[in-house]
């Protein structure tokens, strides 16, 4: 039995991942007749906009990187929003990779490196200040990473993780180069992302200090307990 909604989701995903592709879904079952068409000229840029539809975007335009390195075709689209979660989805030859892999690792490395370099060179982050972590930069990020490889190698028990080493270098190279250019050309957007990342860093550090304080307090209370018991026994 075919589930219409499951097919609809997968076909919409395929249309997003292949810009310009037109897919029609027709249900001719009696009493359940319906028809939909999926066609996105903007490809994965429109995919990010679709995923961010119920959120408030931090900046209007989706950041887009595209290129080919060492036989690997790379496409990346991303946009920050007002949420606190990281919604990054990766694909290889239009197949989802829920466990990530080398393409995701390359993207994350490029993102962290590029934003830290920009923040330091533009005095948003002072030399003696702690570098932004990947988690800080990815807070509120929606991103699509799509690579095309002639011979993909999958790892893990469920084979849902990309293992090709060349994918990491390709994604890292394409994103580093094009994201650096984008940030230099769009300083207002760059500053807004860096400031959001700094807020995430401060919140994370404040939460860590609060946890440490609670743990120390609990430890001290635990240490004082035997003394109280000893006092009671002396009075008896």
What are these regions (language model features)?
Residues 1-236:
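GHKL-family ATPase ATP-binding module
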């Amino acid at each position: 039995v075919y589930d219409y909604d499951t097919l609809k989701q997968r076909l919409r995903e395929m249309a997003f991942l292949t810009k310009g592709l037109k897919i029609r879904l027709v249900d001719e079952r009696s009493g359940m007749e319906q028809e939909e068409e999926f066609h996105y000229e903007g490809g994965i840029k429109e995919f990010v906009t679709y995923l961010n539809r119920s959120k408030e975007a931090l900046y209007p335009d989706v950041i887009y990187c595209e290129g080919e390195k060492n036989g690997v075709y790379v496409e990346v689209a991303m946009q920050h929003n007002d949420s606190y979660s990281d919604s990054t989805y990766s694909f290889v030859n239009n197949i989802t990779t829920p466990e990530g892999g080398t393409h995701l690792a390359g993207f994350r490395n490029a993102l962290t490196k590029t934003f830290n370099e920009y923040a330091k060179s533009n005095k948003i982050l002072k030399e003696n200040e702690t570098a932004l972590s990947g988690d800080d930069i990815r807070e509120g990020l929606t991103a699509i990473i799509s690579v095309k490889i002639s011979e993909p190698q999958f790892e893990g028990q469920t084979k849902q993780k990309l293992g090709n080493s060349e994918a990491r270098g390709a994604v890292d190279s394409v994103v580093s180069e094009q994201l650096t250019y984008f940030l230099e050309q769009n300083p207002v957007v760059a500053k807004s992302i860096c400031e959001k990342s700094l807020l995430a860093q401060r919140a994370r550090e404040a939460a860590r200090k609060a946890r440490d304080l609670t743990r120390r307090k609990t430890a001290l209370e635990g240490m004082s307990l035997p003394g109280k018991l000893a006092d009671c026994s002396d009075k008896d």
